[in-house]
């Protein structure tokens, strides 16, 4: 679904063109199939415990730490094609430099999947719903999607798709072994 016409990759490319169009004053670099541009919204797509970040704290020494984590969202502030690095300013004011090979850790974030949005809230959400596998088109997924919106929610899709999701209460049974694990630890489960 991510690769479909209304999938995350295509929508990100289209939204990038509209919201952050190419400009002679904005540096760009390509990594794989993704074109990154200064001003782009990006998301960290895996935990990196080693990447160093800094945060300017006015009136105090700069903070420094390690670790940018899956789901952190920010904006590309600078692309240096000579030294081959990209600077991202995250929404919590941490700034991190990525060398070009590290760009595999970030992706455009104009559009993100419902799965990637879990745990986040946004002032405005545009939810694009299309038909998909029943295991992905569930009431719980729809609930997760609509509760990401703090103030405004716009749903693009068919009412039939929404109705099917509301009626689809099936969840795949999980065989995690949790009960066995807790029993082995001596935990009594009633």
Where are these regions (language model features)?
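Core RecA-like ATPase module of SF1/SF2 helicases and allied nucleic-acid translocases
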Residues: 2-190
């Amino acid at each position: 679904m991510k690769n479909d016409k209304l999938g995350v990759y295509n929508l990100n490319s289209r939204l990038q063109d509209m919201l952050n169009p190419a400009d002679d004053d904005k540096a760009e670099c390509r990594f794989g199939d993704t074109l990154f541009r200064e001003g782009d919204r990006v998301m960290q797509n895996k935990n990196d415990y080693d990447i160093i970040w800094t945060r300017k704290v006015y009136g105090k020494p700069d903070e420094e730490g390690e670790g940018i984590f899956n789901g952190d969202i920010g904006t590309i502030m600078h692309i240096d094609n000579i030294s081959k690095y990209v600077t991202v300013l995250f929404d919590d004011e941490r700034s991190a430099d990525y060398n070009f090979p590290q760009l595999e850790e970030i992706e455009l974030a104009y559009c993100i999947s419902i799965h990637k949005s879990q745990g986040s809230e946004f002032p405005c959400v545009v939810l694009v719903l299309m038909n998909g596998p029943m295991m992905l088109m569930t009431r719980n997924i729809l609930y997760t999607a609509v509760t990401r919106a703090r103030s405004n929610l716009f749903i693009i899709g068919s009412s039939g798709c929404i109705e099917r999701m509301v009626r689809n209460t099936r969840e795949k049974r999980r065989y995690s072994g949790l009960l066995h694990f807790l029993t082995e630890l001596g935990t009594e489960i009633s």
